[in-house]
Design a protein with these regions (language model features):
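A short helix/loop element that forms part of the nucleotide-sugar donor recognition site in Leloir-type
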Residues: 56-63, 218-232, 388
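Membrane-proximal helix-turn-helix segments that form the acceptor-binding/catalytic region
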Residues: 110, 129-132, 136-140, 167-186
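Nucleotide-sugar-dependent
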Residues: 249, 297-307, 312-335, 341-353
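Acidic anion/phosphate-binding donor-loop and adjacent secondary structure
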Residues: 36, 212-229, 250, 414
């Protein structure tokens, strides 16, 4: 691979353990390991707790440059920008947070414009508005502008009523359309999202799904023996939700299902993670006087594979409004460990098609508490070995980190634009 200078502008980055920051960190690490010269403009790590990690202390109030070294000795330059991190990430506070990063990153970009030229500038949405900085660099210095969409942030804010002002939504949609029209390459993580993005910009959109390291996350034999490590009996049936605890998941349904199953002493519900709505769930647990629900902190990466193997059933929940606006990143890791997931997804969405086509999970309608409860009851007493094997097979075939990154960037790094266009069909055939 030809050595290139690559700039990533993103609101989340390593060492954030989950979500977009995790994928941004792994992507840049892989690119650096291929011999590329990589720079990152980002925030201080704050997600999913919505609190800057304590190791950064008071440094987070000003700019900081770090150097990360990958295994081949190649350095990654990371420029961290100060930004507002709200304790209560409401719709308004999230907007303020993102725009505070936008303006602090803008100052960094003013300096980078006078440095050695980057061949590619990648911005990852959300935050969607960072694409404006990609356009700025492209117009002044040239190079390819790549706009990758992890969440259809504006659509989700509208459909989930996170932002209720139509004026603000329309302004944001106009900015998004402007960014999409100026991007050289647009990509996103699911087939359903590709269709939605294509309708916005009327141009080709590449498939760049989230991935998993299938060598790090794998099924463990005798996984029931791991349960005592986390305070459970070997005979307990563990229903696990592990991930961000936010508004778009509708996690209250877990607690109401637990209330209905209090007479099943062998069924235990574990909620692992952090997020702005965790306190609400803990309060609801206390209100319902639940003894079968356990809140666990984020697990360290070195034991995360064992932890995921503890679960008999995984929960992947989203409200109906989320639809094809987001694709839960936790699913790839669940599939890689051979986990069986109960997934809330509507017919016609990418998530529904993925799960149903591979016979590797149990599908229920979003926002249907009765259907979720029935699925849990039926699943814990069923033989699900085939579902588990199908999940692992799907991950090995479709979600391998090296395969996805190599396939995608082999297309992106085509020197001539007509070469990129001619490779789109090949990319889809490889990954889809």
């Amino acid at each position: 691979m030809i050595k290139r200078r690559i700039l990533l502008i993103g609101g989340n980055y390593s060492p954030e353990p989950t979500g977009i920051g995790k994928y941004n960190g792994e992507m840049i690490k892989w690119l650096a390991e291929q011999g590329n010269d990589c720079t990152v403009v980002t925030t201080y790590p704050y997600y999913p707790e919505w609190k800057v990690q304590s190791s950064y202390g008071k440094q987070c109030f000003w700019y900081k440059t770090e150097t990360q070294i990958v295994k081949n000795g190649n350095p990654i330059k990371v420029i961290r920008c100060p930004h507002f991190v709200p304790k209560n990430p409401s719709g308004l506070n999230r907007m303020i947070s993102e725009f505070s990063f936008f303006f602090s990153a803008y100052l960094v970009m003013m300096l980078l414009l006078f440095k050695k030229k980057y061949n590619q500038v990648i911005t990852v949405a959300p935050p969607f508005e960072m694409g404006l900085l990609g356009i700025l660099y492209k117009k002044i210095r040239g190079g390819e502008f790549i706009y990758h969409i992890q969440d259809l942030q504006i659509d989700a804010a509208r459909d989930l009523a996170i932002i209720k002002s139509k004026v603000i939504i329309n302004i944001f949609l106009s900015i998004e359309k402007f960014i999409l029209s100026h991007a050289d390459i647009v990509s996103t993580i699911s087939v359903g999202m590709i269709k939605k993005v294509r309708n916005k910009c009327q141009k080709e959109v590449l498939f760049f799904p989230n991935w998993v390291d299938v060598n790090t996350f794998y099924p463990v034999a005798n996984r029931h023996d791991l349960k005592p490590n986390y305070g459970f009996d070997t005979t307990d049936k563990i229903i696990l939700y592990s991930g961000a605890i936010g508004n778009k998941q509708g996690l209250e349904a877990i607690l109401y299902c637990a209330k209905s199953l209090q007479n099943r002493k062998d069924i235990k519900f574990a909620i692992c993670g952090s997020g702005p709505y965790k306190a609400n769930l803990i309060h609801l647990k206390e209100k319902l006087n639940l003894k079968n629900v356990f809140f666990l902190p984020l697990q360290p990466i070195k034991t995360f594979n064992s932890f995921l193997n503890v679960a008999d059933i995984h929960l992947v929940l989203q409200k109906s409004g989320a639809g094809d606006l987001v694709m839960p990143s936790k699913l790839s890791t669940i599939l890689s460990v051979g986990g069986v997931a109960i997934v809330t997804a509507s017919k016609g969405t990418s998530l529904y098609e993925v799960i149903s086509s591979g016979n590797m999970g149990i599908l229920v309608e979003p926002d249907n508490e009765k259907a979720l409860l029935d699925a849990i009851i039926n699943s814990v007493d069923s033989e699900l070995k085939e579902h588990s094997e199908n999940a692992r097979l799907y991950a090995e075939k479709n979600l391998s980190a090296y395969k996805i990154l190599d396939d995608f960037f082999s297309v992106v790094f085509k020197v001539e634009r007509n070469q990129v266009k001619s490779s789109i069909g090949e990319l889809r055939a490889k990954i889809a």
